């Protein structure tokens, strides 16, 4: 088999795999969203939203490819073998900013271990870089990423929003809202359980 044909087949396999993962997530998302239909009461609707998210646990996470603000490329499915912590946030979100000290502590705590921390923000690159000069946030930073939030993961509940993905690429936990000062201990427990394979 010549090199060009081999390369072409590899590309086809990658594209096919990405499509399968997206379809699996999309199909389960539609199934989980059924419980939101015909719910008028706001408090019950929020409860159903949270139930919808928990319904997605165990599904293969959809792939995305994006660049960090420092120009490094991240492709989610290439991170298999590691626990991946995704944090959807924004610099203008007070509860998001409150979690940063705890999140920085998590990065230090898991240094050298198979855990990857990625912050996915809605801010433009210059605005995010300016913010980070004042308040360091030690996750890998992806900016202007509404597409990942809305189209890839199909989220709509708001931020902060965290997703923990296990070493097999499956969604382990989805968490809406801020843990504030407790962000380190709250997520340390979840990450430790994920690393050890506990449900």
Where do the protein language model's features map onto the residues?
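Acidic helix N-cap motif at the loop->helix transition within catalytic regions
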Residues: 127-129
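Conserved redox-active cysteine motifs that mediate thiol-disulfide chemistry
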Residues: 88-105
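N-terminal targeting signals for export/organelle localization
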Residues: 2-63
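Short pre-active-site segment immediately N-terminal to redox-active cysteine/selenocysteine motifs
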Residues: 82-84, 88-92, 124, 158
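A short beta-strand-turn-helix
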Residues: 63-84, 110
């Amino acid at each position: 088999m010549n090199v060009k044909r081999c390369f072409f087949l590899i590309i086809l396999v990658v594209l096919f795999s990405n499509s399968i993962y997206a379809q699996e997530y999309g199909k389960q998302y539609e199934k989980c969203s059924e419980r939101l239909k015909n719910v008028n009461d706001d408090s019950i609707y929020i409860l159903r939203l949270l139930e919808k998210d928990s319904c997605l646990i165990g599904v293969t996470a959809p792939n995305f490819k994006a660049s960090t603000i420092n120009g490094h490329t991240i492709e989610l499915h290439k991170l298999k073998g590691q626990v991946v912590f995704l944090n959807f946030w924004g610099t203008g979100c007070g509860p998001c900013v409150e979690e940063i000290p705890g999140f920085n502590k998590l990065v230090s705590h898991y240094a050298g271990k198979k855990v990857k921390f990625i912050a996915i923000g809605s801010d433009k690159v210059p605005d995010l870089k300016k913010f980070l000069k004042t308040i360091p946030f030690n996750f890998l930073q992806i900016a202007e990423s509404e597409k990942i939030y809305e189209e890839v993961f199909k989220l709509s509940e708001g931020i902060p929003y965290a997703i923990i993905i296990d070493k097999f690429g499956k969604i382990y936990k989805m968490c809406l809202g801020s843990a504030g000062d407790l962000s380190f201990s709250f997520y340390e427990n979840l990450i430790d359980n994920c690393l050890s394979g506990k449900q």
